[in-house]
Regions:
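PRPP-associated nucleotide enzymes
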Residues: 1-219
Length: 219
């Protein structure tokens, strides 16, 4: 994985993937998985946040649900930062993300705020791009944005920098690529589902995705 960009920072090199093997172990779920993501967030924050930064004039924006696994730890690193959540859902027909609700109105002077967006898996980048698009409506500035993720693939990263070249992106590790169904390679499942369980009205999407992918493999 030799992709480079001046605003991309990758913490763990490809040859040290064994350090994040638990991320791909689908038997690691719930509190155990939350701790794994939290510990990696602590480590990543040493790269993304300066030593004496306590979060003055900053806001942490977790993309629900999975982003909370990172923001819960980041708030301890940046205790003075505000937190404004954004909830993404999938259109049940197109499977594309849309904003269900957000807490951005509570943020005063958003144009001057430093922003930390948390979302563990950066695959197609659809949720992050939709978040950045939505933030602009409130006055947030790309040059003040730091995106923090566990894993990301080149195609999703390129989409972000093409549309938002001024943001900074901090990754724990680069993924190999992306599957046809939009999940990362190596496959790590749905982070929100591994943490909190499958949403009732989306369980059919998970089954359809898994079945469809298996059929493609058998061709």
């Amino acid at each position: 994985m030799n992709y480079k960009h001046p605003n991309l920072f990758v913490m763990i090199p490809y040859e040290e993937r064994n350090r994040v093997s638990g991320y791909f172990d689908l038997s690691v779920v719930g509190e155990e998985y939350a701790k794994l993501l939290g510990d990696l967030t602590d480590e990543l924050s040493t790269y993304a946040v300066s030593k004496n930064d306590v979060g003055e004039n900053a806001v942490i924006i977790p993309i629900l649900r999975a982003g909370m696994s990172m923001s819960n730890r980041l708030t301890k690193r940046l205790p003075k930062a505000d937190v404004a959540r954004i909830s993404m859902r999938r259109n049940l027909h197109t499977l594309k993300p849309f904003v269900a609700w957000d807490e951005f109105e509570q943020i005063k002077e958003p144009e001057s705020k430093r922003v930390f967006i948390t979302d563990p898996a950066l695959a197609t980048a659809g949720s992050i791009l939709k978040t950045l698009e939505h933030m602009k409506k409130y006055g947030f500035k790309d040059e003040n944005v730091v995106i923090m993720a566990m894993f990301g693939c080149q195609s999703g990263i390129e989409r972000i920098f093409k549309e938002h070249p001024e943001v900074k992106l901090f990754l724990v590790h680069m993924a190999d690529g992306i599957r046809e169904d939009g999940y990362l390679l190596p496959y790590n499942g749905d982070t929100g589902d591994r943490l909190y369980g499958v949403r009732e009205n989306e369980s059919w999407i998970v089954k359809l995705s898994a079945t469809g992918y298996q059929r493609r493999l058998q061709r």
